[in-house]
């Protein structure tokens, strides 16, 4: 739709603590040969290091070792450079934790592709642990967002006696395009592993901030 309107969209990534964006999904002309679905998949990545940033890496936060560039192994995005904050105001403990190992710990979980492009999978605090399996809430949200009746999706952990936690989806529907809980669960089963499929779907108007982010 954006292409039809003549807009060229580029994904960038950054945090308040890094004074602007530190990666950008710079386009490679060779990708023009790919079909639209593949191009959109690439455009969803956060990208490669921006020139004003000294270092971007995806690491195991426990060992501070970079994860394999296989597009599958999840680690935490680490950032280094003079664009990174000095620390949190009057909070030495939080500063020490965030800067452990000489890198800023973003709290964003991501994979690194073989071409050096980063793609976020989830926030570390939003990972759902179900029966010992780590589930990305973003992966489920992105799947639900592909359904024509879904306007916005938010997935959270729901306590479960058997599995500890299970995914629960909150859905804001597209006007005049009704859909049932059963239909959305079946839709998710087409592409997601069984343990990742939401066990409950709640339809509601999702609360948002003034900038449109889901609260």
Tell me the role of every PLM-derived stretch:
Residues 3-12, 16-117, 124-127, 140-141, ...:
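Conserved AMP-binding/adenylate-forming
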Residues 22, 199-200:
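Extracytoplasmic/periplasmic beta-strand context in beta-sandwich domains
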Residues 12, 53, 154-155, 199:
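Residue-level detector of family-conserved "landmark" positions at structurally sensitive sites
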């Amino acid at each position: 739709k954006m292409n039809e309107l003549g807009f060229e969209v580029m994904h960038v990534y950054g945090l308040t603590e890094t004074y602007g964006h530190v990666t950008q999904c710079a386009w490679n002309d060779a990708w023009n040969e790919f079909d639209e679905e593949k191009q959109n998949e690439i455009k969803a990545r956060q990208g490669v290091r921006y020139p004003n940033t000294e270092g971007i890496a995806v690491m195991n936060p426990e060992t501070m070792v970079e994860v394999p560039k296989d597009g599958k192994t999840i680690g935490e995005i680490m950032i280094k450079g003079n664009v990174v904050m000095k620390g949190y105001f009057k909070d030495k403990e939080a500063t020490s934790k965030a800067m452990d190992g000489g890198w800023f710990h973003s709290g964003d979980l991501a994979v690194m592709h073989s071409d050096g492009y980063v793609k976020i999978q989830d926030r570390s605090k939003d990972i759902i642990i179900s029966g010992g399996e780590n589930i990305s809430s973003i992966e489920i949200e992105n799947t639900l967002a592909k359904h024509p009746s879904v306007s916005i999706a938010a997935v959270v952990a729901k306590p479960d006696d058997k599995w500890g936690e299970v995914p629960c989806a909150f859905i804001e529907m597209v006007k005049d395009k009704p859909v049932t809980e059963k239909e959305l669960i079946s839709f998710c089963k087409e592409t997601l592993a069984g343990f990742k499929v939401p066990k409950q779907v709640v339809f509601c108007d999702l609360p948002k901030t003034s900038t449109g982010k889901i609260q």
